[in-house]
């Protein structure tokens, strides 16, 4: 039977092999196998069985310094940290001088911070002093004016060096990038659209593995790249508040995203998400969740736990029904449900009494429930591109409504209650079936834009002259032959009429 690391581990666990023999067999695999995964697993098992012999240390030291595979060097460094931390300094010095792999450099730096000896601190101080990046050096000079460099612990210094390594690597790959630092640590990082700056082989199609080292990062912008997945390690971004992943190709989110409990802004628009993890409800600080233009057909019930959420954008998904509860989402003031497959306004929306903006355009609504009038805080209501034949009388009770878009429906009239919409500024009735307008439309004294494009109007009520705030009147594609003379006074005041 071919020797395998799993078999060695099993035989050692069953006491078929003693520790010395198990170590020798694992070393044999590491040195002789052509199976990379078997070599990696053998190195890891050395840590699991606490193989703290000198021969093992020499092997790991040699792997760290000279193996051609980055993953082998990285794994060797991890095992040295776990088993040989007290003697790790010398091989780590070599890594600092000669290693080019970012992952290995970051791991070595992290280990040095944990050693916390005079020698490791000296190595880190020298590394900080050798930083030539002008922007980082300037930030560090300000930091060291407030506090002597010698007063920093090895761990604090290692974080500064790690952040420098990361910026250096990013600038090498993508050229100039945008970032902000505070006290030597990156707090804001903009990698949006970096793939367009460089040749194809350096496109950003994987989530940057170094992110776990950016423990002070509060803003990360990765929009307009080619990411397809988010790793579980996203949970390590404990300081993140602003996270933009829009315009990528992300198909799913890990459960660990729920660990980002101070995250306020999450933008995932224009991805390929088909579902959300239930852990999304654990984002207790979230105020902005943008899921526009994905492939969602449902929402998890845990969405109701987002009590601080102010904006939820679900425009352009595959939603037909919302079988969730929004009770408790008292902060939600903007809900976008446009361009879905909704035939009936979901009853769960009724509980959202703080809504100021409700987007329902581009659905299959043929009727509105009377409770639409219960949204007393609503300022903008978008119902364009549906199948509405009439509006409920209750719509006139939405006293704060300022914008109402109803273009491309099947409306022939407006309810009399409409004249109570005294704050209405924008009314779009284009591409409906109106043959006339009610005389009371002149009571909408706040109206600034009235769009009537593409109806069957032959005349206009004289009461339109009372709309002294009107700035734009669109009459294109109707049957009106001449502009009524009573509108001339409004034109003199600046009214623009499109006809």
Spans of features found by a protein language model:
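Structural detector for internal amphipathic alpha-helices that build alpha-solenoid repeat scaffolds
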Residues: 2-17, 37-52, 62, 71-85, ...
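Amphipathic alpha-helical scaffolding segments comprising HEAT/armadillo-like alpha-solenoid repeats
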Residues: 17-30, 51-64, 85-97, 117-129, ...
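Terminal domain-start segments
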Residues: 19-20, 24-27, 38, 43, ...
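Charge-rich, solvent-exposed alpha-helical interaction surfaces
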Residues: 25, 29, 45, 59, ...
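A generic tandem-repeat structural signature
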Residues: 69-120, 237, 241-252, 256-270, ...
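The feature captures the LRR N-terminal capping module
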Residues: 130-223, 228-232, 241-244, 251-255, ...
């Amino acid at each position: 039977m071919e020797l395998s690391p799993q078999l060695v581990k099993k035989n050692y666990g069953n006491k078929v092999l003693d520790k010395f023999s198990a170590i020798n067999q694992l070393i044999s695999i590491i040195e002789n196998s052509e199976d990379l995964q078997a070599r990696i697993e053998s190195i890891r098992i050395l840590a699991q069985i606490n193989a703290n012999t000198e021969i093992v240390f020499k092997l790991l030291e040699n792997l760290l310094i000279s193996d051609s595979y980055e993953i082998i060097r990285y794994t060797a460094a991890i095992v040295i940290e776990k088993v040989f931390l007290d003697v790790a300094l010398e091989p780590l010095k070599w890594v600092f001088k000669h290693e080019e792999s970012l992952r290995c450099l970051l791991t070595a730096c992290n280990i040095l911070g944990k050693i916390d000896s005079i020698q490791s601190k000296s190595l880190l101080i020298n590394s900080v002093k050798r930083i030539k990046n002008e922007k980082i050096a300037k930030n560090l000079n300000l930091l060291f004016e407030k506090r002597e460099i010698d007063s920093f612990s090895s761990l604090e210094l290692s974080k500064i060096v790690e952040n420098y390594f990361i910026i250096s690597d990013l600038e090498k790959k993508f050229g100039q990038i945008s970032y902000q630092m505070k006290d030597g640590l990156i707090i804001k990082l903009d990698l949006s659209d970096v793939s367009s700056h460089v040749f194809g082989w350096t496109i950003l199609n994987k989530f940057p593995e170094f992110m776990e080292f950016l423990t002070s990062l509060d803003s990360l912008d990765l929009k307009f790249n080619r990411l397809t997945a988010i790793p579980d390690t996203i949970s390590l971004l404990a300081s993140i508040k602003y996270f933009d992943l829009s315009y990528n190709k992300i198909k799913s989110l890990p459960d660990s995203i729920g660990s980002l409990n101070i995250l306020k802004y999450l933008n995932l628009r224009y991805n390929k998400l088909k579902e959300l993890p239930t852990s999304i409800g654990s984002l207790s600080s979230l105020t902005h969740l943008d899921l526009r233009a994905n492939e969602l057909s449902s929402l998890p019930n845990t969405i109701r736990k987002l009590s601080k959420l102010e904006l939820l954008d679900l425009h352009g998904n595959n939603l037909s029904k919302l079988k969730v509860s929004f009770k408790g989402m008292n902060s939600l003031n903007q809900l976008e449900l446009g361009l879905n497959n909704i035939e009936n306004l979901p009853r769960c929306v009724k509980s959202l009494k703080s809504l100021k903006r409700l987007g329902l355009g581009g659905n299959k609504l043929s009727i509105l429930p009377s409770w639409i009038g219960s949204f007393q805080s609503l300022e903008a209501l978008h119902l364009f591109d549906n199948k509405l034949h009439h509006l409920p009388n209750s719509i006139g009770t939405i006293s704060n409504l300022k914008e109402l878009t109803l273009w491309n429906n099947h409306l022939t009239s407006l309810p009399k209650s409409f004249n109570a919409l005294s704050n209405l500024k924008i009314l779009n009735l284009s591409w409906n079936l109106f043959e006339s307008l009610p005389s009371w439309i002149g009571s909408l004294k706040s109206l600034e834009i009235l769009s009537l494009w593409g109806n069957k109007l032959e005349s206009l009520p004289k009461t339109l002259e009372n709309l002294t705030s009107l700035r734009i009147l669109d009459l294109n594609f109707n049957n009106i032959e001449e502009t009524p003379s009573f509108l001339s006074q409004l034109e003199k005041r600046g009214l623009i009429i499109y006809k």
